[in-house]
Amino acid sequence: MALCAIAFVPCSFAAVTAGFSPGGTALNLILQFAGSARQSVDVAAYDFTSQPVAQALAASVARGVSVRLVADEKKSRDRWSLVSALACAGVQVRVNGMYSIMHNKFIVTDGSAVETGSFNYTSSAEKRNAENALVITGEPETARQYQTEFNRLWNESSPVACSADRMN
């Protein structure tokens, strides 16, 4: 019997799963995590050029999942950025220019689980860099903290509309 059940404190059975790149385990973990959402996917991203992650987010929108992205304002203007394309795919997008760089890289699904790590949502992170990604489930306080931070970033950021000239 778990100690928490005996002591009348809430039980938390956390699971932490790690993925690494190059090699695909980080990307696969992120794709599986984003695809598992039933109600919401909230993404904070410094750089966003990954076609597979963009496709996973667009597929979530198509399934009726609410998807929001806060991206770094300067990086979102890069030639290969998919930020505008995501807005055109139905993702609610905002850009944040409040900091030297908005360097976050995390996803919160359904307000209850978190993916975080060094992995930018880019092709380079997948194929050229040594990166990591962690998925944390069963830790409601951790998820609450990340959701609160996402909401703070969202509220201070500027909306992005679909722009046909920036669709990739």
Which stretches of residues belong to each language-model region?
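Structural recognition of the beta-strand scaffold that forms the well-ordered cores
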Residues: 42-44, 68-71, 94-95, 107-108, ...
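Short N-terminal segments immediately surrounding and downstream of signal-peptide cleavage
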Residues: 14-38
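Extracellular/periplasmic catalytic domains that process cell-envelope and extracellular macromolecules
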Residues: 35, 62, 86-87, 100-102, ...
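Primarily the HKD phosphodiesterase
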Residues: 32-92
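Signature of lipid phosphatidyltransferase scaffolds
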Residues: 109, 113-168
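N-terminal signal peptide c-region/cleavage motif recognized by signal peptidases
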Residues: 9-10
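Sec-dependent signal peptide recognition
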Residues: 1-3
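Solvent-exposed loop/turn segments at secondary-structure junctions
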Residues: 47-51, 73-77, 99-102, 113-114, ...
